[in-house]
Each structure stands twice: as structure tokens, then as C-alpha cells.
Amino acid sequence: GGLAVVAGVGSAAWDRLFAGPRPAELHPFRALDGDRHQAPATPGDLLFHIRAATMDLCWELGSLIVGRLAGAATVVDEVQGFKYFDERDLLGFVDGTENPSGSAAEDAVTIGAEDSAFAGGSYVIVQKYLHDMTAWDGLTVEEQERVVGRAKLSNVEMADDVKPANSHVALNTI
């Protein structure tokens, strides 16, 4: 079933659990407040990202972890995910098109020699999006494509002279 788990330790928990040095870039998330959207800081101490080909394996491992941490940790949030059609998000667009793959993906997320005590580790930020699906579904496909900056069916990115400067693609290109 391809069972895998990634464990993460939050900034405050790190200091309580470990006496030695901390990863150089480990810090609490700073809340972001924009004109229309906010990203609040909701720190946690432990994160377990569990994945498998079937949900029962995820459930079993999650239950075992929670059981082992009983009395020491309390579950404050739990999210189940699933593969949606051909790698699309719930808005109907292909997700992760620009994400690196293969060794480039590993290089993009792995701590290297710059913080040698933690080389091979990584950092994680979790974002939870709440979409107004009724409003989204009320938009025409053309309007949705302008919001995202890609063609919905073909996943082709709009040309720069057509793509709105405030589209998802324009604002989230690193």
C-alpha cells in the first residue's frame, strides 16, 4: 500500500524537546494579512503527514501514533485528502504543474550543507484553504481561467500579455 509518514516538530515544541541547536530556519509562522485574504498563524507542536494507497492504512497508522502519544499530546486537527481525478484540485485545475520533480524536487526542499547539523531534513508549512464553491461555480470557465492564469481543460499557462497580474499563477511563481 505505499504507506509513508513524515513527522514534523513545531518551533515551540522543538525548544521543549531538544536541548541542542535548532534548525536555522525553524521559526513560528508569521500571520499574513492582505486586503482580501488572511493567513493566520495557528502553530502546532507535532505534525504527522500519513499517506498510502488506501485510507485504511492511513487510519491504522494514525491510530497507532495517537495511541502512543496518549497523555502527552492532543489531536487538534485532522485532515483527510484524496486524489481528485487527474491530479486536479477541487476547483478543477491541475495542481502542482510547476512543482519540481525527481532530484530537483529533493534539492528544492532538503536542508543542505548550509545547516549541516540538520542536512537531509526539511521544513513544512501547512495551509488550509476554504473555498466558496457556490461562488466559484457561478463563474464562467473563462473567468475561472483568468483567476488561475491557466486553461482549465488543457492546463496551458496563459501568455504573459493575457494573464492577469493578480492571477494565481502570476502571484505564486517563485
Model-found features: residue ranges?
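Long, histidine/aromatic-enriched segments associated with O2/redox biology
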Residues: 1-174
